[in-house]
């Protein structure tokens, strides 16, 4: 089975195949269905899925918002339309993943220095 982040990368390459049309709202519905299916099948949450749960808070900080709107609605608000919002999501997602990678790398470095 492919990882959660690999799935998002596949969606980015061929959004119409997975979403029907290029739309951030369709992406949200797809991801909600994916999450629901995994829960129904009692598949444990992966590290990437757990990490993605922080995306909402990260988006709020990125746009300097403390809002009750979903990340989907926030990105859509700052976009021209659904298609533009989807493209913007993938840019933000890449930034989110890279930020987390550097944060994780820093934590590992700190642990190795402390352990010496």
Model-derived features with residue positions:
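Short terminal alpha-helical segments
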Residues: 1-36
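Short, solvent-exposed secondary-structure capping/transition elements
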Residues: 20, 24, 39-47, 68, ...
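Short alpha-helix boundary/capping elements
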Residues: 32-39, 59-68, 82-83, 101
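Short, charged early-sequence alpha-helical segments and their helix-coil boundaries
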Residues: 42-76
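Residue-level detector of well-ordered alpha-helical segments, enriched
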Residues: 3, 7, 26, 51, ...
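Short, charged/polar micro-motifs that form catalytic or ligand-binding hotspots
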Residues: 13-24, 45, 75-83
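Amphipathic alpha-helical binding modules
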Residues: 68-116
